[in-house]
């Protein structure tokens, strides 16, 4: 069924999923602009949203606040919609260093993009899908509000080929070069084409295995086939094919000429300005860099960092709203914001963060002032582009609640698990009380998480627990990537019984073995003790049937009161449902393998664990770095960007130690 979403799932909606789906769908059909789904941890929010997408049948953009979540959502949605276009759109900078300059140390950092090719393919696959069909879901990080080329230009430059069409072979080659394809008869890869007599083979920018073979008879296209690029095996005949540009910043020749004139004019004005300020080094640097870029644009129609000239290429006035992925969607599209209490503040902050970094580059002659217009949307611009939007969170923020006419709740877990019980206990004698509670959990082979407010308190507590003979680990921000994952794995395996940390809301801490969460200094109002943070922290004990939370505090703050009441309210709803349906809560069974995918490379080589980096010979270290780099590329190819980023960090650490 072309153009319609087909949801494939081994189970039907259950618990309070059916009512949540019905309410959200009804709201969308009535034209409600903002809706909020308040879904408790582990209630199957992704499945609910998938049902909503399938029923309203609109192109959908799902925004997540980091690549880990985006990757997980992408995998889940791909399973639910195997017959539809589920795409993935993240910025190269989600993993790699953007261009920057540090004046204090006179350090210029070029943009570093190692696993660019895979991400680039996925981005092209996403934008081309939007022009070819309506049954499209794009899972994106917040970088989807970042500047992109003009969608009109992108659409107009598509090369459309049909069997029987009259076109000279050389005219086709010229058109391919215009949309940034390179002729390469030897190294045939994405974004290239090759020619053999009357046969032109094109490798689309959005593919990595299949290419298009166009066979001519004179000046007529005789047949079009889809071919395996490696083996040459014919995969199918095509009547029609659309070749999308190999860059999102493509521009027609006449527009490019105009853009180059405008860039030259801006360059002259800026050079005069810098020289008048006595900034001769900056002026020389800017002239050299910009003239080189202009030369590349004249010769190749492209240059490295072309996005910095996007305002000129699109002939937009200074300060105007940039084009972004949102402009590639049709007008009636739907936006889903996952974990909205974190994602919306991120969307809000992107413009300022980017502006500060670019301003330094402009001030020191690395970029023209127009580069400031290659930027993310401001939050107000983002709001103007919303057609209909659903915010999804266990703890929606004030913005979502203010804008949504009613909140749709999803409280019941398919596993029957309840929100944990909560105790508030005085701080006097809290550590000895905590030790008693931990020992009870150890007896039952369960684990404990303890959250403190300061680094010193965490360190002192860890030492004290060790002296009391408890197997404890301290998880803090300075711990290296690989170690962090190993500590979590060791907690699950029982090497540790307790994990002490300051911020337990970072990803990777949904551990079914944890039945007790202890919150020290619960009555100190602040970021980590706000009602939202408390509810999220309490949720860390909601994956175990014996889940319990102890807050150590001498007074009950407003945040504590709200968090406790909300948890009680949810627990009562869940208990009532379980009683009615005869459900017995069972702890989630989760393979320990899940947690340790990222240590795969280190386990493969065994070197990293068997020998500390300092003890390795130069040759051993280089060998390990090579292995890890290969593993990193494999991970990115498999879309496991979390692992790719972790491996990148490990490589960085190894190089630093060398």
Curated annotation (Swiss-Prot):
It is found in: Cytoplasm. GO terms for biological process: nucleotide-excision repair; SOS response. ATP binds at residues 39-46. InterPro entries: Helicase/UvrB_N, Helicase_ATP-bd, Helicase_C-like, P-loop_NTPase, UVR_dom, UVR_dom_sf, UvrB, UvrB_inter. Pfam families: Helicase_C (PF00271), ResIII (PF04851), UVR (PF02151), UvrB (PF12344), UvrB_inter (PF17757). It comes from the Bacteria. Its main location: cytoplasm. Residues 26-414 form the Helicase ATP-binding domain. SMART domains: DEXDc (SM00487), HELICc (SM00490). One of its GO terms (molecular function) is DNA binding. Residues 430-596 form the Helicase C-terminal domain. GO terms for cellular component: cytoplasm; excinuclease repair complex. Forms a heterotetramer with UvrA during the search for lesions. Interacts with UvrC in an incision complex. The beta-hairpin motif is involved in DNA binding. This is UvrABC system protein B. It comes from Geobacillus kaustophilus (strain HTA426). The lineage of its organism: Bacteria, Bacillati, Bacillota, Bacilli, Bacillales.
């Amino acid at each position: 069924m072309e153009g319609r979403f087909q949801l494939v799932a081994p189970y039907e909606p259950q618990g309070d999923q059916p009512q949540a789906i019905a309410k959200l769908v009804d709201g969308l059909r009535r034209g409600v602009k903002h809706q909020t789904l308040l879904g408790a941890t582990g209630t199957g929010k992704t499945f609910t949203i998938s049902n909503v997408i399938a029923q309203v049948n609109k192109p959908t953009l799902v925004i997540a606040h980091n690549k880990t979540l985006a990757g997980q959502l992408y995998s889940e949605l791909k399973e639910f919609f195997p017959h539809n276009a589920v795409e993935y759109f993240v910025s190269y900078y989600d993993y790699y260093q953007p261009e920057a300059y540090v004046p204090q140390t006179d350090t210029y950092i070029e943009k570093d993009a190692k696993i660019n090719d895979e991400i680039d393919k996925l981005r092209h696959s996403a934008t081309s899908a939007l022009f070819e069909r309506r049954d499209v879901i794009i899972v994106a990080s917040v970088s989807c509000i970042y500047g992109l080329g003009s969608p009109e230009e992108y659409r107009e430059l598509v090369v459309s080929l049909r069997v029987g069409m009259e076109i000279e072979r050389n005219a086709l080659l010229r058109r391919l070069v215009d949309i940034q394809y390179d002729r390469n008869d030897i190294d045939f890869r994405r974004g290239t084409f090759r020619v053999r007599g009357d046969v032109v083979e094109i490798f689309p920018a959005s593919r990595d295995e299949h290419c298009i073979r166009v066979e001519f008879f004179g000046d007529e296209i005789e047949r079009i086939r889809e071919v395996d690029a490696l083996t040459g095996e014919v995969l199918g005949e095509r009547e029609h094919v659309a070749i999308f540009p190999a860059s999102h910043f493509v521009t027609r020749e006449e527009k490019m000429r105009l853009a180059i004139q405008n860039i030259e004019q801006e360059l002259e004005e800026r050079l005069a300005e810098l020289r008048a300020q006595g900034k001769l080094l900056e002026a020389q640097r800017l002239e050299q860099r910009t003239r080189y870029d202009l030369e590349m644009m004249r010769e190749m129609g492209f240059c490295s960092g072309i996005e910095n000239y996007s305002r000129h290429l699109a002939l937009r006035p200074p300060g105007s709203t940039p084009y972004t992925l949102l402009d590639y969607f049709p007008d009636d599209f739907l936006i889903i914001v996952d974990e909205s209490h974190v994602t919306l503040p991120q969307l809000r902050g992107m413009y300022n963060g980017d502006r500060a970094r670019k301003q330094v580059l402009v001030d020191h002659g690395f970029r023209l002032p127009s580069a400031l217009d290659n930027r993310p949307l401001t939050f107000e611009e983002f709001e103007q582009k919303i057609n209909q939007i659903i915010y999804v969170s266990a703890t929606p923020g004030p913005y979502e609640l203010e804008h949504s006419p009613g909140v749709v709740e999803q409280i019941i877990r398919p596993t029957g698990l309840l929100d944990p019980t909560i105790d508030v206990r005085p701080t006097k004698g809290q550590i000895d009380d905590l030790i008693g509670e931990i020992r009870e959990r150890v007896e039952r082979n369960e684990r404990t998480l303890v959250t403190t407010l300061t680094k010193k308190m965490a360190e002192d507590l860890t030492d004290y627990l060790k002296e009391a003979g408890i197997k404890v680990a301290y998880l803090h921000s300075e711990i290296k990537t690989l170690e962090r994952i190993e500590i979590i794995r060791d907690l699950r395996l029982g090497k540790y019984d307790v994990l002490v940390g300051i911020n337990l809301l970072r990803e990777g801490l949904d551990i079914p073995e944890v039945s007790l969460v202890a919150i020290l200094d619960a009555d100190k109002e602040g970021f980590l003790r706000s009602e939202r943070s408390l509810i999220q922290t309490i949720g860390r004990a909601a994956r175990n049937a014996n889940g319990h939370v102890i807050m150590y505090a001498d007074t009950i703050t407003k945040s504590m009161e709200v968090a406790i009441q909300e948890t009680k309210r949810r627990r009562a709803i869940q208990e009532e449902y379980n009683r009615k349906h005869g459900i017995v809560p069972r702890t989630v069974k989760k393979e320990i393998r899940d947690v340790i995918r990222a240590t795969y490379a280190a386990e493969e080589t065994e070197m990293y664990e068997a020998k500390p980096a300092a003890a390795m010979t130069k040759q051993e270290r280089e060998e390990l770095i090579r292995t890890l780099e290969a593993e990193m590329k494999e991970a990115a190819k498999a879309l496991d960007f979390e692992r790719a980023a972790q491996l990148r960090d490990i490589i960085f650490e190894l190089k630093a130690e060398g």
